[in-house]
């Protein structure tokens, strides 16, 4: 039987995500971001609730991406997630994309020319952002042209790189409905961005996601819920460059801007440049919020939930892969657990995210 991996945020889970799961074949394993996500934001609802949504709508097993995989640029995000899914025995990686390309062919190209392609990146001007450099690399070596406004396509190319040399088949699924960044409400498949933007519209939410009631009754957060804490962190941290990926230039820009702005969005607008994209700045600000420092990634895989089929699969691989199903006196990943504790500060109604939590079990055999 096919074992399909899916890398996701489900922020929040919507009809387009259900479509992706419906189109995927065989056993479906999701590697999902935890309480902070790749574009540099706190997840609107917590990881356990999002895992439950996925399991109730087609996923068989949901595992957590460690913080330093989940909150990273596309290449590191993809590489870390594929590493985890490979440990779980996937043979196919399914993903949504705005552009239908031969991603398996692109993966083969990268597998043969990785050294030359990486070397090419080092020859490009420093003023270019990493996404811009990546775009030029793919144009030169594979004739692929795209813009920075198609994040799912950018991730798909990162998946092609991450799967190079592995026995994992790439299965792109054409994205349905609104664009990733769209806030449009009239389309059949609304984007996660639109759902976050219009979360106070119950009728829109109800038609746009399969778990509307669970979403609407769950504690929700945005960056503004953490802005005061972020201000405190920036103002009291004597040397921001001690934190993960904060260089001297960014530290100066952030220290200066934090005294001039009154909202998180203003802060991002003030700090971002052509070189430092808004997504990168948001991720940097999360590192500062959490107090993140570079650390090694955990070798164990943390389980958020499973169905009966997912539990059976775990029993088959338990002697090959180290599984964490409950975090107690022994930590799983200290930085992820630190991030969870900060996440809980955003809303007093958020339940405990780490200690003693056990995987969600969904019986969908009927």
Swiss-Prot record:
Its main location: cytoplasm. It catalyses: cytidine(34) in elongator tRNA(Met) + acetate + ATP = N(4)-acetylcytidine(34) in elongator tRNA(Met) + AMP + diphosphate. GO terms for molecular function: ATP binding; ligase activity, forming carbon-nitrogen bonds; tRNA binding. Transmembrane segments: none annotated. Its EC number is 6.3.4.-. It comes from the Bacteria. ATP binds at residues 7-20, 96, 152, 175. InterPro entries: Rossmann-like_a/b/a_fold, tRNA(Met)_cyd_acetate_ligase. It is found in: Cytoplasm. SUPFAM superfamilies: Nucleotidylyl transferase (SSF52374). GO terms for cellular component: cytoplasm. Keywords: ATP-binding, Cytoplasm, Ligase, Nucleotide-binding, RNA-binding, tRNA processing, tRNA-binding. GO terms for biological process: tRNA modification. Belongs to the TmcAL family. NCBIfam families: PRK13670.1. Catalyzes the formation of N(4)-acetylcytidine (ac(4)C) at the wobble position of elongator tRNA(Met), using acetate and ATP as substrates. First activates an acetate ion to form acetyladenylate (Ac-AMP) and then transfers the acetyl group to tRNA to form ac(4)C34. This is tRNA(Met) cytidine acetate ligase.
């Amino acid at each position: 039987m096919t074992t399909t991996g899916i890398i996701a945020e489900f922020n929040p889970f919507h009809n387009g995500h259900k479509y992706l799961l419906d189109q995927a074949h065989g056993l479906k394993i999701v590697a999902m971001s935890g309480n902070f996500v790749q574009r540099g934001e706190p997840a609107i609802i917590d990881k356990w609730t999002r895992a439950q949504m996925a399991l109730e709508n087609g996923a068989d097993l949901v595992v957590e991406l460690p913080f330093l995989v989940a909150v990273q640029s596309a290449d590191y995000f993809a590489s870390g997630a594929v590493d985890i899914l490979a440990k779980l025995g996937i043979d196919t990686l399914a993903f949504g994309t705005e552009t239908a390309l031969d991603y398996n062919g692109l993966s083969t190209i990268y597998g043969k020319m990785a050294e030359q392609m990486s070397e090419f990146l080092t020859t490009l001007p420093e003023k270019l952002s990493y996404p811009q450099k990546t775009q030029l690399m793919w144009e030169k070596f594979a004739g692929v042209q795209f813009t920075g406004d198609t994040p799912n396509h950018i991730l798909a190319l990162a998946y092609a790189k991450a799967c190079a040399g592995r026995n994992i088949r790439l299965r792109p699924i054409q994205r349905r409905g609104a664009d990733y960044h769209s806030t449009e409400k009239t389309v059949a498949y609304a984007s996660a961005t639109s759902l976050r933007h219009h979360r106070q519209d119950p009728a829109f939410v109800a038609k746009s996601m399969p778990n509307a009631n669970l979403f609407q009754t769950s504690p929700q957060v945005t960056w503004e819920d953490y802005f005061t804490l972020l201000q405190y962190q920036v103002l009291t941290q004597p040397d921001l460059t001690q934190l993960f990926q904060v260089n001297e230039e960014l530290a100066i820009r952030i220290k200066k801007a934090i005294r001039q702005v009154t909202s998180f969005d203003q802060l991002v607008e003030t700090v971002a440049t052509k070189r430092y994209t808004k997504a990168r700045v948001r991720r940097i600000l999360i590192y500062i919020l959490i107090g993140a420092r570079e650390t090694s990634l955990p070798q164990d895989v943390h389980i958020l939930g499973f169905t009966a089929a997912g539990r059976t699969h775990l029993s088959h691989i338990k002697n090959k892969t180290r599984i964490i199903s409950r975090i107690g006196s022994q930590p799983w990943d200290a930085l992820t657990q630190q991030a969870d504790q900060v996440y809980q500060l955003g809303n007093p109604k958020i339940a405990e995210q780490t200690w003693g939590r056990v995987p969600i079990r969904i019986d969908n055999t009927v």
